[in-house]
């Protein structure tokens, strides 16, 4: 499904969360558990559908054991 309605920065953020989660071998369910968020919320963040709150950004960063700034790093291909 195309992600036309999402903002590019939300998509980039979600892609980064997904990449970091996958690199750590975590499921969305486990990341949700570690961050205190619901799995469907984590899924919608990864798809770029959420305008995520700062508190939730910190919870995800803590769950992934990375600094918050690491969630905003993008790598050119």
Model segments located where?
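A detector for short, charged/polar N-terminal pre-domain segments
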Residues: 1-12
């Amino acid at each position: 499904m195309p992600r036309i309605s999402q903002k590019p920065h939300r998509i980039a953020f979600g892609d980064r969360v997904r990449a970091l989660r996958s690199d750590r071998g975590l499921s969305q369910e486990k990341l949700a558990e570690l961050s205190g968020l619901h799995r469907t919320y984590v899924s919608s963040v990864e798809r770029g559908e959420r305008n995520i709150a700062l508190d939730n950004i910190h919870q995800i960063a803590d769950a992934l054991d990375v600094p918050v700034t690491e969630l905003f790093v993008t790598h050119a291909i």
